[in-house]
């Protein structure tokens, strides 16, 4: 694998990897899409993952809620590719860090509800240092992995295997974190 540094006006290619052969699915469907639309789609993807995080239930004896966040993250990697999928997931994290209620727990949104810094730190520690922190780390790994695999020329029919591996990559850091 050879790493190539290149500049491009039409992409956010800071460091391109030469083995990436295909465009993301969204760019393949809409070849004339601009970066502004891709950025807007990445923001929409973060909103989608935020919405899917709110659809949750708890299994008895398990402190981690069961949500559809993982599905949303897998779709982001598959549709947006590894670069824009990563932008979307990072925007999701930054939204949670500033206090927007995007995570699947009760201690969220403290910055805009209560300006008491101790409450903000408590919410931050609960989300990122608590039992769900490993899942959040796995979201980044899975999005980049799925986007890279799909852009590396895997057949669209074999996408299910990359999604299964992506799910595995979400759960490995989560289990280690617990």
Sequence positions of predicted segments:
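Hydrophobic transmembrane alpha-helices
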Residues: 2-90, 98
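Short helix-perturbing small/polar motifs within transmembrane alpha-helices
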Residues: 4, 10-31, 37, 41-44, ...
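Small-residue-rich segments of transmembrane alpha-helices in multi-pass membrane proteins
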Residues: 74-79, 165-174
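Alpha-helical membrane segments and adjacent membrane-interface helices in multi-pass membrane proteins
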Residues: 53-144
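Hydrophobic alpha-helical membrane segments of integral membrane proteins
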Residues: 60, 64, 161, 172-175
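C-terminal TM-helix exit segments that contain a strictly Trp-centered aromatic cap at the helix terminus
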Residues: 95, 99-100, 169-178
